[in-house]
A protein has these predicted regions:
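RecB-family 4Fe-4S metal-dependent nuclease core
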Residues: 1-216
């Protein structure tokens, strides 16, 4: 049975509602809602910030207040790896996509000696996320010389930055924090059991009209 490589976003989507995950990502028999104007604007902002950092393009005038941060990021010494893909097998060894057990793409990785910085630009509502913890574990697996990873979520709309630092000895705990959800997802693929998980999102934010909780 083919089970696609999991990512932080797929685990989050599955945990929110396995049934919705199934219809949108496995069976693909339900179309998600088209992106709202806010989502489209967020994607454009994300791209503009990426281009400002990676390609030295000017920011839109409405986002000029971020120019100071863009300049600081560009001035950080080290090897810059924009849009860096991570793919690991079940033994946490780097691999190609055919053997990938887990995967992710970091907006920006900066390597400098025994340390790395991983940055992710966010345009949605500020909320807790373990995505960059997972990316730190990826970095420890990819580069044995890395002993410390500094992460930063940059919340572009809310003008906030959430920073956290991980040491190499944190890697095992990071993996353990994801494994229960990954195991549940794998079991759903194997058994075909994708239970609905009703929540407030069912009222307006679920396209699965065939679900008894949709719209309630």
């Amino acid at each position: 049975m083919y089970i696609p490589a999991w990512s932080a976003s797929s685990v989050d989507a599955y945990t929110t509602c396995p049934k919705k995950y199934y219809h949108l990502r496995v069976a693909r028999d339900v179309q998600d809602f088209p992106p709202s104007e806010a989502v489209v604007a967020g994607r454009e902002l994300h791209k503009a910030f990426e281009n400002a950092v990676n390609l030295h393009e000017p920011l839109p005038s409405s986002q000029a207040h971020w120019q100071g941060l863009v300049d600081k990021i560009k001035a950080i010494p080290g090897e810059k790896l924009p849009e860096h893909p991570f793919m690991l097998d079940e033994f946490h060894e780097p691999c190609d996509k055919r053997g990938a057990w887990t995967r992710g793409i970091a907006d920006l990785v900066i390597k400098r000696g025994k340390e790395a910085i991983i940055i992710d630009y966010k345009t949605g509502k500020r909320k807790p996320s373990e995505q960059l913890a997972l990316y730190a574990a990826y970095a420890f697996a990819y580069w044995p010389e890395i002993q410390k990873v500094h992460t930063a979520f940059i919340w572009l709309k809310e003008k906030k930055i959430d920073r956290k630092t991980y040491n190499r000895e944190d890697a095992a705990g990071i993996w353990q924090s994801f494994l229960p959800a990954v195991a549940r997802m794998r079991k759903s693929y194997e058994t075909g059991d994708w239970p609905a998980r009703p929540s407030g999102l069912c009222r307006q934010w679920c396209p699965c009209e065939g679900c008894c909780y949709c719209g309630k």
